[in-house]
Structure formats: structure tokens, C-alpha cells
């Protein structure tokens, strides 16, 4: 959780301060949105808590990209409703994509909610809370304002925090036929480059070593006019910031992956050798129905170019099975593409119908049992590929940015390679924030086990 830039110093906590509990569902953008919410509410005097039972204010930051995520949010609201019945003055707020999508309808379904705010209204939260505290009247605000005030909210990192998210843009103009994002995040809107640079310098001044740039489609950053700075140029400016040692970004759209951006992987020393490049299907027919704007051969050509420019690049992707009209042959083409590319990792999903998208009206719905069967086949294959990729790293020496203690064993440190592989190894707490050299001894499906080479320790500046 991020700290507010105006948080008062000192170790004593005032007993009259209120507590806020934030639960986040969904993507990295939502995670960072929650960090910004925490910063805003800390400035208002709230203290973040990890225990919903002691909260005076609960905010659920929701996702609606798939039905499973939406149902999880609704289920969680039922639990919070029970808390509210025990604690009359508890305020419950709902934000994120499900809030944006349903608005007043969500309030009708769950009347215990006190306020609903959309994806473009985060910066208005302090005002919403003040109004509710005074009047106890419910608020629903999901207007798609210009989003820059919300995505530009600054939050300082916690002590010892090594990596931070930085939102550079919000929204999407692509309207893939299965995707609700353009409807809940709005059209593409980019933050001014000077604001982004200022935020990253601030993070560097507070000890952050790695930034991950966020956007629904970072490749289309500031493309409205030819005179604006593009994404590859932005990366080149961030490269110059003292104290920042690594840059990452997500997510990229294959059709917008330019040669200038591809060559950045060899030109920029701070740009990590990893790209998340959703391919969604290996069938040209399905890609056209999805309105993806590229073909299988287009995608393969970009992968080949990436691997030519940066031979050790790690490539991960998203894929959907069971899209309307997907035949056995279409699915086979997806499997063939996976075997051809051999992704480092893959985020795979069954097609989930989202109201308001073009795919809802398409014929050829695939049954749930068949979707599940295809998903299981695909995931089993990807596990083979992921383990194969990880095993290939055994015996190699990797630079690892130490992020903190391992979740699995508090005696171990954990960090990531440039290729975004998690590495666990023995070491002391003083190494957090340092770039260290680690010999990879053993590979697993989701992580690597290594041994730090003491003579290769390089303390970050």
C-alpha cells in the first residue's frame, strides 16, 4: 500500500483517526488505482488497515472483464453488508470497472452501498466522503470525465518499496468484440509526459528502483497528433532518470507494436527484457471476429523481430478459448501457434460474455464443457512450455533486483530477473533494493531457486 505524500510524521497514532480497508480485484491498473485511493484518503486523515472488521470505511475496487470477477465482487459485497449491520456508521464504497458498468443498478441490487464511483472519478473521493459524512445521502458518480486528474494522483512509496506502478494512460479505442474495457475505462487518454517524468523522479527520490508503466494499450500512448511524444520516446526519456534502474510496461497491442519500440529493447539498458503481448487466438478467422486488427502471420513476424533484436526476451500473452464460432480447427491453430512460439507464460481464459459488446450477438456459442476441455488442454501444454523455459535458465547467472522477503519462506529473499522470472535465494535484509548476481540452481513452474554470488553483489545507487 502506498503512503500519502502529506502523511504526518511520528510513530504515535491518534486514536480519533478513522480506518479505511481497501480490497482490490482485477488488473495492475486496479492495484495502482487502489494505491492512489489510499493516498487520497490518508491525506483526509484515514489510516489504512488490513482488517475489514476495524474499518470505518470500506472500498471495494472491482473488475468486470469477465463474469467470474463480477460475481466475486458481488459476493464480497454481501460479506460487507453483514459488517455494516453490526457497525451502523460503517461506509461502503464501490469503485472500478463493475461500478462504472452498473452504476445505479448496483445500488439497487445492494442498497447497503453508500457511494459508487467510476474509473474517472477517483480524485473526487475526498469530496464524496465529506458529503456523505455530513448528509448520509448516497452518491453515484460514474461520469466519464477527462481521466487525467484521476490517473495523475500521486502517492509516495512505503519505506523499502523497490518497485512502483505508474499509470501513463487510460482507456482504449480498439473495441475488440469481446471486451468491455472501452465502455468502462473510456477512450484513450494520455497523461502529459512531463507529469509522468515528474512522478518517476519523485519515486526515484524515495528509493524506488523499478517502474512499471501502465495503460490498457501503452503502445498507443499520445498518438493523437504527430507532434506528440510517443511511447518509445517516453521510454527514452525515462531511461535518463537517475536512480531508476529498470523499466517495464504493460499491456501492449500487437497491431501497435512499432519497430521503434521493438528496437528499444536493444537500445535502452534499463528496459527489461520482457513483453506481455496478448495474441488471443491462433486462428485468423477468430482474430477477425474478435476485431483484433492483425493476423497470425503479423503476430509471428513481430515475435520473430523481437527475438532478433533481443534474443533472451521473455514473451507472455493472453489467450481466449471458446470464442463464439471457434471450431476444433480454430482451436488447433491456437495450439499450433503456442507450439511455434513457446511462450514463457500464458494467461488463459474461457470466453466470458459481456453485455454491450459485439460478441454477445454472435452465433456459434461454444458450450461451457467444451470451453473447459479446451482450456485444460491449453493450460497443460503451456505448463510444459513454461517449465521448459525455466529449466533452460538452470546454471545461468542472472541479475536480480531484490524486492523483499519471499512469500513462501520468510528466511529467503525474492526478486525478479530482467525477463520477469521470480527468483528466491538466501540473503540478508540489507540487500533489499540492491541488484545482485544470482546463480540459478533449480527451476520450478512458477519460480526459480538460486544462490547469490557474493562477489557479484552490486549495491544500487
Curated annotation (Swiss-Prot):
The cofactor binding remark recorded in the entry reads: Binds 2 [4Fe-4S] clusters. One cluster is coordinated with 3 cysteines and an exchangeable S-adenosyl-L-methionine.
Q: What class of enzyme is it?
A: transferase
User: A GO molecular-function term, please?
Assistant: 4 iron, 4 sulfur cluster binding
Which Pfam family, any one of them, does this sequence belong to?
TRAM
Question: Can you name the source organism?
Answer: Syntrophus aciditrophicus (strain SB)
Which UniProt keywords are given for this protein, alphabetically ordered?
A: 4Fe-4S, Cytoplasm, Iron, Iron-sulfur, Metal-binding, S-adenosyl-L-methionine, Transferase, tRNA processing
In terms of PANTHER family, this protein maps to: CDK5 REGULATORY SUBUNIT-ASSOCIATED PROTEIN 1 (PTHR43020), MITOCHONDRIAL TRNA METHYLTHIOTRANSFERASE CDK5RAP1 (PTHR43020:SF2)
Cofactors that this protein relies on: [4Fe-4S] cluster
List the catalytic activities from the record: N(6)-dimethylallyladenosine(37) in tRNA + (sulfur carrier)-SH + AH2 + 2 S-adenosyl-L-methionine = 2-methylsulfanyl-N(6)-dimethylallyladenosine(37) in tRNA + (sulfur carrier)-H + 5'-deoxyadenosine + L-methionine + A + S-adenosyl-L-homocysteine + 2 H(+)
The protein's name is tRNA-2-methylthio-N(6)-dimethylallyladenosine synthase
The UniProt entry, under InterPro entries, shows:
Elp3/MiaA/NifB-like_rSAM (IPR006638), Methylthiotransferase (IPR005839), Methylthiotransferase_CS (IPR020612), Methylthiotransferase_N (IPR013848), Methylthiotransferase_N_sf (IPR038135), MiaB_methiolase (IPR006463), rSAM (IPR007197), rSAM_horseshoe (IPR023404)
Role played:
Catalyzes the methylthiolation of N6-(dimethylallyl)adenosine (i(6)A), leading to the formation of 2-methylthio-N6-(dimethylallyl)adenosine (ms(2)i(6)A) at position 37 in tRNAs that read codons beginning with uridine.
State the family named in the UniProt similarity comment for this chain: Belongs to the methylthiotransferase family. MiaB subfamily.
Q: Where in the cell is it found?
A: Cytoplasm
Coiled coil (UniProt feature): none
Which CDD domains would you find in this protein's record?
Radical_SAM
| Principal location class | cytoplasm
Q: Which SUPFAM superfamilies match?
A: Radical SAM enzymes (SSF102114)
Which residues does [4Fe-4S] cluster 2 bind?
Answer: 172, 176, 179
Q: State how it assembles.
A: Monomer.
**Any idea where the MTTase N-terminal domain is?**
18-134
Q: Which residues form the Radical SAM core domain?
A: 158-388
The EC number(s) given in the record are 2.8.4.3
State the GO CC annotations: cytosol
* Residue ranges of every copy of the TRAM domain listed in the record: 391-454
In this chain, [4Fe-4S] cluster 1 is annotated as bound at 27, 63, 97
